[in-house]
Amino acid sequence: MTESNNGVLVVVEMLDSQPIDLGLEMLGLARRLADSSGGTVTAVAFGTGLETTGELLSAYGADQVLINDHEIFASFHAEAWLPDLSKIMVGVAPALVLIGHSFSGTDLALRLAYRLVVDVATGCESIDIVNGRPPMTRSCFGGLAREV
């Protein structure tokens, strides 16, 4: 994580106006990473009927919650989410972004990385902060080895 911004942004996927478990787990990880580096956690949610989502995401560790509640976000469409998420990324300027390794999360992460010309690591199993940098570990070779 950079010295200028130690923030972690988490894109929380929603299902039937409720955050999926993976999103809540990533908020816990983000909270741990932010606490170890003196940063903050920003949660972003897209969907409809998200009136109480902010309180829930704050309870799971978000310092700031950005809700995008509109009919266009009722189901996942990367083309619909990407412009708003790109603007959020530029405005928040996090050091690290966590997006779940789901079908929609992977689709969104790759498109976002391409649009913003940033690195992306998919399928990560662990991440920590070591000397101000976030080494990530993921499986390779069918789970027979790990790469960092």
Short names for language-model regions:
Residues 1-148:
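N-terminal glycine-rich FAD/FM-binding segment characteristic of electron-transfer flavoproteins
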